[in-house]
Amino acid sequence: MKIGLFFGSFNPIHVGHLIIGNTMAETTDLDEVWYVVSPQNPFKKNQSLLHEFDRFDMVTAAIANNPKFRASDIEFSLPKPSYTVDTLTYISDKYPQHSFVLIIGEDNLDQFTNWKNHEQILHHYSLYVYPRPDSSNSFLREHKNVRLVAAPLLEISATYIRNLVKQEKSIRYLVSKEVEELILSRKYYSNY
């Protein structure tokens, strides 16, 4: 199978993440999209994160009804911070029967040369890139392993959602009903 790996903090997972995943699953040659919950992004060292298992629970709840989606906690057992190249190597060794593609936003493509061993990633893996606001035209757009995928341009921010929760305002329609129920019942982000 050809699997798209969609890495993220998912703090929380929101409808923007789901729309991007669905677009990738339905409009490209991917068989599945795996939402890889990252315990710690090396570029966001000081970010206040909900515990990784709580974020994994939200991802699992959000994608439960889509057979083309899968939640992955594979980075939980790897050294932190999580570097994409290390996870890709590990996951490719663990699942040699699959081929993997990296799903990233255009804003990440702009910063891709700052990633650990980015040349190795580009040499061995394809990047499926979705549009993001305020992205520049990275020279990597022309790379043979970079595929630009037409997807809705969404400006939904997890920070915005967390702030709404803290202010006791509705997050309806920004997250799935299942995620909203988890956030409210477990009081996630109330003291953010």
UniProtKB/Swiss-Prot annotation:
Annotated catalysed reactions: nicotinate beta-D-ribonucleotide + ATP + H(+) = deamido-NAD(+) + diphosphate
GO molecular function terms noted in the UniProt entry: ATP binding; nicotinate-nucleotide adenylyltransferase activity
Metabolic or biological pathway, per its Swiss-Prot or TrEMBL entry: Cofactor biosynthesis; NAD(+) biosynthesis; deamido-NAD(+) from nicotinate D-ribonucleotide: step 1/1
Cross-referenced Pfam families: CTP_transf_like
EC number annotated for this UniProt entry: 2.7.7.18
Cited InterPro entries: Cyt_trans-like, NadD/NMNAT, Rossmann-like_a/b/a_fold
Record's function text: Catalyzes the reversible adenylation of nicotinate mononucleotide (NaMN) to nicotinic acid adenine dinucleotide (NaAD).
The protein's name in its UniProt record: Probable nicotinate-nucleotide adenylyltransferase
Organism the protein comes from: Cytophaga hutchinsonii (strain ATCC 33406 / DSM 1761 / CIP 103989 / NBRC 15051 / NCIMB 9469 / D465)
Primary gene name: nadD
